[in-house]
Amino acid sequence: MRERIRNNLAGHHRRAVTDPTKRHAAVAVVLVDSEVGEDRVDPVSVEEWNDGREMAAAHLDGRMVDVSGGAAFLLCRRASRLSSHAAQWALPGGRVDPGETAVDAALRELREEVGIALSGSTVLGLLDDYPTRSGYVITPVVLWGGGRLELRPAPDEVVAVYRVGLHQLQRDDSPRFITIPESPRPVVQIPLGNDLIHAPTGAVLLQLRWLGLEGRADPVDELEQPVFAWK
């Protein structure tokens, strides 16, 4: 799997976004091992988080359950006290600091948020840039974490880290696309467990499936975010 993903990324003409009005950020897509049944209890109130979301239409209750097993990626639940995107699902990541590359930033944020120190030799490649409504261009960096990494999330930023099996990305009900009156572009939804992951994280995960796992080069940067993620 490692070489397949590496080769698929290497053979892809990556879409880079250059927009001086947006800030640059990077996220770490970390591939690891996982065991069936190691899901943890979500510390965020699902009922509160689901308020106003159309979960019933997707026959989901918002709980991240039964997602582990086999090759997996790391997914974080952001702390509820954060000033932006509080309690949302996200990949480890953040702003690219002056003098850093996207790879530098992804490795640093992974270390700061999840307590994992990986080297540049673990980089399998980059996915396409994704421009967000909140003023960022996100560069996803795919990393090979290998076996059983010890996760030590920083509680002021991350309240939970899940190992989500890659099989979740290839479910029969994934991906989902819906329309919203605020935009002509389709909103992408990626079902994981009993929850829905939206762009930008959802777009990154969809390209991880399409390009990384299946060798499919379809773009995802025009897929829309839900309105609650625009700020």
Where are these regions (language model features)?
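NUDIX/MutT-family hydrolases
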Residues: P153-L192
